[in-house]
Structures are given as C-alpha cells and as structure tokens.
C-alpha cells in the first residue's frame, strides 16, 4: 500500500541522522524536519514511483546514457520546476546527504574534511565531506539540469516546427 510521499520541491536537503528509530530526515525551510524510517535513497525512490512512474535506478540509467555520469550523479526529479537533488556522500555514512539544487546557494570549507552548505534562505548545514567534492557535485547538477532543459526545449521546437508546416514528424514512420 502506497502512502503519499513526504518529499516535495520545497525540501532543502535530505540528511542521514544518527538515531535509534530514524535513518534520515527531510529538512524544509520554516518548518520542523520530517524524520523517516527509510534511507535517503528510498525516500527519493518513493517520490519518483508515486508521482512520475519511474524509479531511482531508471533515472540513474538515463543519467549514465545521456550524460556519461556513472556514479553519484544528480537526479532530475522535475526539470520544469527545477527540482534536482544532488548527493554528497559523507565519510561517516553510506546513506548520502542530498541537496536540492533550487535552494542551494554555495558551500564553503569548514575545517579538515568538513564543508558548510549554505541555502538561499540563510540556513546552513555542516557535512563531513570534502569541499572540492561538493563543488564538483554542484557543477554536475547544473550541467545535467542545463542539458535536460535544452533537450526538452529542442524537442518541443522540433515538433512545433513540423506542426506549423503541416508535415508529419519523420520519427513516426
């Protein structure tokens, strides 16, 4: 039995927690974090299945085929709303810390092996991850969102152009 997923585009990040009962929590601006009994990737998978009829494995396969990113790549949930989550693995946990690109502002080094992630509304989170790795993940997320948006726009332009001239599109033969 499926329940409505708790994740939505307003999520700032999904962070693993050290708790007896919960594995992670979804952090939103202006409201209390929502703890979950599931790992971070299971929350994302549940959202993709419920709203988009796909799963995390399919999105990763597409990422590998279309963008040549093989591991730890950003997941485009919905490019129209710019809902993109990118992972930051921490050395202490295999349960990745996921950041919503829409709410991300910047990251700064915060000591040895630590990075501070700044969100656009003033919230900050400190993670046990290398600063250069965080920057690389951010750049990947921007590149993937940019390409997927351009691919969608180009496809729409191609179809519109053929409809204008009353020509059937050549891919339906």
Locations of the language-model features?
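Eukaryotic intrinsically disordered, low-complexity regulatory linkers and tails enriched in Ser/Thr/Pro
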Residues: 1-99, 103-173
């Amino acid at each position: 039995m499926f329940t409505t997923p708790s994740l939505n585009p307003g999520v700032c990040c999904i962070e693993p927690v050290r708790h007896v009962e919960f594995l992670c929590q979804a952090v939103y601006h202006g409201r209390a974090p929502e703890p979950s009994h599931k790992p971070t990737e299971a929350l994302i998978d549940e959202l993709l299945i419920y709203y988009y009829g796909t799963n995390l494995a399919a999105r990763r396969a597409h990422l590998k085929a279309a963008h040549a990113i093989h591991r730890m790549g950003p997941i485009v949930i919905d490019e129209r709303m710019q809902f993109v989550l990118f992972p930051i693995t921490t050395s202490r946990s295999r349960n990745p810390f996921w950041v919503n690109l829409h709410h991300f502002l910047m990251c700064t080094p915060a000591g040895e092996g630590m990075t501070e992630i700044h969100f656009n509304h003033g919230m900050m989170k400190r993670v046990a991850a290398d600063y250069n790795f965080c920057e690389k993940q951010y750049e990947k997320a921007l590149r993937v969102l940019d390409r997927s948006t351009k691919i969608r726009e180009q496809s729409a332009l191609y179809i519109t152009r053929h409809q204008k001239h009353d020509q059937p599109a050549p891919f339906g033969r």
